Amino acid sequence: MNQYYTSNDHFVLVPAIMLALFGCAILLLDTWIIPNPKQRKYLLLVFVLPGLALTGFSLWRQQSFLAESGVSEITAFQGSLTVDGFALFFNWIFLIAALIVSIVSYKYLDIEGEHHGEYYGLILLAQCGMFFLATGTDLITLFIGLELMALCFYIMVGFLRGERRSNEAAMKYLILGAFSSGFLAYGFSIMYGISGSTKLGDITAAVAARDPWDPVVFLMMATTSIGLLFKISAVPFHMWAPDAYEGAPTTITAYLSTASKAASFAFLLRIFLGPLASVRPAWEPLLIAVAIATMTIGNLAAITQSNIKRLLAYSSISHAGYMLLGLIAGNATGIKGISVYILVYTFMNLGAFLVVVALRRKGIIGEDVDDLSGLMHKSPGYAVLMLVFLLSLAGIPPTAGFLGKYYIFLSLIETGHYMLAVVATLYVAVAIYYYFRLVRSMFVGEATEKAPVTSSVGLRFALAASGIMTLLVGIYPEPFLQFAQRSLLK
């Protein structure tokens, strides 16, 4: 399983081609051919779903080829793209998130009065950028993928053009995102200067031949880390996340908090387990400090929030801290733990935000904690699903969230990071407290709005699927653990 197979370049690129073609087709049709806003709704059925279906089919073909041929990876474009278990694992996560968000957006955009075709086009183009982040093994490929994804999210965060907070969030995200990309580009330029190549394999060998405490190597590590830590909203580069999560359409917040975070972690793992692997003595103490600060700020700030989206934003920040612990451990259990965590986090976080989407109705924004009051009495199904998602986010068995935290904590114990494991456990207790605020509001609070929550068939399907997966992964984890095991970088 250690051999390489260099295929027809287009075989590797087919998923990205499908996403780009359908995404651009939607943008062109929306601009020139479909001026009627009511007809734009059908772009979802005619272009988005077929585009995602063809993307899924091409990923399945790549996965089948790897299984049948016995090769460990497929390379293309002289090593700039690599399809392996790692890339396929993350690309399936991106596809699932894009599919769920697209399905639930149909009715949500009706309520917001913002049915514009570019919404769906940007979802597909953002996923195209994510494909390059998971598959890229070249600095140029990775940077192009990152910027394509980021540019799409800058626009989607500000999609509610009539709302000041949406415009403000997009502007903050754009400015800070561009600033972080500058740091990342500077770090990449140093990598190129050290190695004379943009290929990750060549850079890894060149950096390994140098002293980890060489000032040039340390500067490369520091600037690259700043850019990467911003993308996963780690402290102290997290300032954009609460505003972006609150200001964006809730469906986009769900997409940003799951698919974008997964893509950013795929990027981070490619770099830290590749070019920066030999510099571990320099970055490990810094990453420990960042992880502790991220868990601290994320969990403590969430306690004071009255807006559900901001609360979940700080929760998302704290989860980034937990995932960083797996990288700090650095063993196979830790990296597997990150993969498992990202998989389960996708379903439980999507589900939590979809409940907020369900609360949104004409005249009711549905984002305050008080909007959950009495939900058990008027819409028990939604309350039970939200309970499942919150228990999973807190890491309570038998939900999937427990599995993710278990492997992260196990990796810390295996590598002797006992104090980190204790600190992380204490912050789990803090998280249980603020998640319980939402549970108490749903089950004990008095309903301010007596009418039951109504939603589209697509939203109900997405919520049910997310809830089932959140429980299934926790109760019967074996196939999902095998799936995550195949994602380990060789």
Regions found by a protein language model. Name each.
Residues 1-490:
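Alpha-helical transmembrane segments of multi-pass membrane proteins predominantly involved
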